[in-house]
Amino acid sequence: MATDHELTLYVMTGCPYCIKVKRFLADNGVTIPERNISTDPDAEQTLIAVGGKRQVPCLFIDGKPLYESSDIIAWAQENLL
């Protein structure tokens, strides 16, 4: 299913919850642009500035943050599959 949403997934190297989300997306053929806060200081600053906290995984949907791996997966199932 195509989406008209602007999406960005914020992750961190070694984060098990990020891996869970990324595995779900890959298993379902869904590609979302990623920003890794471990290697990209600008991504980390954006995550904090817009989302208000340094928590990953975080899916920005049209500029609004969605936290928690289970919530991100549920949103993807509903809107992207």
Which positions does each model-derived feature cover?
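Hydrophobic "lid"/C-terminal helical patch
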Residues: 76
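Local sequence-structure signature of Cys/Sec-based thiol-disulfide redox active-site neighborhoods
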Residues: 1-30
